[in-house]
């Protein structure tokens, strides 16, 4: 059984390793011949763990300030300079209530059992007792690691591809499809991995689209022809049905709020009368009585009440699994034909996505013009012979900004990193916001642009919604996670960028700026489009995504 100390040493070695091959080799060498291989891999990838601990950084600080009898204010201030694990370790070392162990005694099994128990409790008094118990058997470094596991970020600069391909060169691609870590560990040989497929009731990493700024580029990507599908302004939903059991997953593979999808349990059996088990890729949109789409955000429970004659409607665009058969390796035109055979539309409830078979540039231009005239979001272009590749950006998207001369072909989903005081009538409140993106390579957040222009009501709401730490443009108070040049040091920084809001930002064009730290990429005339409540920081535009957007 692997000890926590061994696991910590592995994490440290991975962090300091220089590249993908070296990191994967370290993991491969470590797990070879170990009986708890699955547990090691699972804990190396805490972000994939579906256990929910009901605790953010601020709550962890609050609880450990009580346990250690330390100043919560001092602990929060320390957190502003680094990471939660470092803060807890520092104050654990200084506290006089619980003496840290001199020698590590915990196994990974002990830690995993603790995390399972933590995920089952929600009362603060119970959390205090459990976190006290674990601290009493930890060294300072042990507790730091445990807290980082609770925070679901080990800071080892190694994501799923690095870790899973240590098992087998094909493991990461198989995981994208099956999303079943345990099955991959148990079938690690290539022959066995090839037998793993989509399974009903387990979410599949959704296939994605990259931006495209010209019709000509689309035909270079799909020379044999393409489908042009309406880009729906709703929420991506993956539907799973197994007999009378249903599951609905969002684009980040989390359960969808029940009020948005409960009605589907009545209509899916009617639309798919022959299906015992099925997995669908689709978009849920609020439509009026004429089946006209209502704006993004109208799916919210309060917003929906504003549209009295509206319905939730599922626009189905793909079938990934049907009665025991994995459909993902079948060409799209065959999947679509099969879908037409097995699905019966229910008006305003379950309908086919709007799809056009495109054979020339003139036809694509006409379809795009029509979509934009109807004030639709744009088009998604798909290879007619394409297989479904989970997690891969093999499709193309052309959004409404494409036709505006000199404008960005696509927006960027950036994270609010900080804020500045406004001027004049907006003096004394946060009115200008620092937007940025995550750099997977460095593990830091980089700045892209400043954004303003919100109306008074929106600004009033944002003062309460955004959790900020006031630093008064002091360079010494810039948190370790933020890379910002002196000219853009804000009055406030967010307490935790991973809990911050994600805003869709569009503008005239991507531009270069020596003052911004995201590889010098910025946005000319940035404008706020909407809050992306359907995304977490993981689905926001990362630095490598931003680089690709500027290239396209």
Swiss-Prot record:
Coarse class of the protein's main subcellular location: host cell
Binding site for Mg(2+) 1: 283
Enzyme class: ligase
Keyword presence, Nucleotide-binding: yes
Biological function: DNA ligase that seals nicks in double-stranded DNA during DNA replication, DNA recombination and DNA repair. Recruits cellular topoisomerase II to sites of viral replication and assembly.
Family: Belongs to the ATP-dependent DNA ligase family.
Protein name: DNA ligase
Native source organism of the sequence: Variola virus
């Amino acid at each position: 059984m692997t000890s926590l100390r061994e696991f910590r040493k592995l994490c440290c070695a991975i962090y300091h390793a220089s590249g993908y091959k070296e990191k994967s080799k370290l993991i491969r060498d470590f797990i070879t011949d170990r009986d708890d291989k699955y547990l090691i891999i699972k804990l190396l990838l805490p972000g994939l763990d579906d256990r929910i601990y009901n605790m953010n950084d601020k709550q962890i600080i609050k609880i450990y300030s009580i346990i250690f009898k330390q100043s919560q204010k001092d602990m929060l201030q320390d957190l502003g300079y680094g990471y939660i694990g470092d803060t807890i370790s520092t104050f654990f070392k200084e506290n006089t209530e619980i003496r840290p162990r001199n020698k590590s005694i915990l196994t990974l099994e002990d830690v995993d059992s603790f995390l399972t128990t933590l995920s089952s409790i929600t009362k603060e008094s119970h959390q205090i007792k459990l976190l006290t118990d674990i601290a009493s058997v930890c060294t300072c470094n042990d507790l730091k690691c445990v807290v980082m596991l609770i925070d679901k970020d080990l800071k080892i600069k190694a994501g799923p591809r690095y870790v899973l391909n240590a098992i087998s060169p094909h493991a990461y691609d198989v995981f994208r499809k099956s999303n079943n870590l345990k099955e991959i560990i148990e079938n690690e040989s290539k022959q066995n991995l090839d037998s793993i497929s989509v399974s009903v009731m387990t979410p599949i990493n959704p296939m994605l689209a990259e931006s495209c700024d010209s019709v000509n580029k689309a035909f270079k990507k799909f020379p044999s022809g393409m489908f042009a599908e309406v880009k729906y302004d709703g929420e991506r939903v993956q539907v799973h049905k197994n007999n009378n059991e249903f599951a609905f997953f969002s684009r980040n593979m989390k359960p969808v709020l029940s009020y948005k999808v409960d009605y589907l349990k009545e209509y899916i059996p009617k639309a798919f009368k022959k299906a015992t088990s099925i997995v669908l890729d689709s978009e849920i949109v609020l439509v009026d009585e004429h089946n006209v789409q209502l704006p993004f955000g109208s799916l919210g429970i309060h917003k929906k009440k504003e549209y009295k004659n509206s319905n939730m409607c599922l626009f189905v665009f793909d079938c990934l699994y049907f009665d025991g058969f994995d459909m993902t390796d079948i060409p799209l035109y065959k999947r679509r034909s099969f879908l037409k055979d097995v699905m019966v539309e229910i008006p305003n409830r379950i309908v086919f996505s709007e799809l056009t078979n495109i054979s020339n540039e003139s036809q694509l231009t006409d379809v795009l013009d029509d979509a934009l005239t109807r004030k639709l979001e744009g088009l998604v272009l798909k290879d007619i012979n394409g297989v479904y590749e989970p997690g891969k950006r093999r499709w193309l998207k052309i959004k409404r900004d494409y036709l505006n001369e000199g404008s960005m072909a696509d927006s960027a989903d950036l994270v609010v990193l900080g804020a500045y005081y406004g001027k004049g009538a907006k003096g004394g409140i946060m009115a200008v916001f620092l937007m940025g993106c995550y750099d997977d390579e460095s593990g830091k957040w980089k700045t892209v642009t400043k954004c303003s222009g919100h109306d008074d009501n929106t600004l009033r709401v944002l003062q309460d919604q955004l959790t900020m730490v006031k630093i008064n443009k002091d360079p010494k108070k810039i948190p370790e996670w933020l890379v910002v040049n002196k000219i853009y040091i804000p009055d406030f920084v967010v307490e935790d960028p991973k809990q911050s809001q994600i805003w869709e930002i569009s503008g005239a064009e991507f531009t270069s700026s020596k003052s911004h730290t995201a590889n010098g990429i910025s946005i000319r005339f940035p404008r706020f489009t909407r809050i992306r409540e359907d995304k977490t920081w993981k689905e926001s535009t990362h630095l490598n995504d931003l680089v690709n957007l500027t290239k396209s």
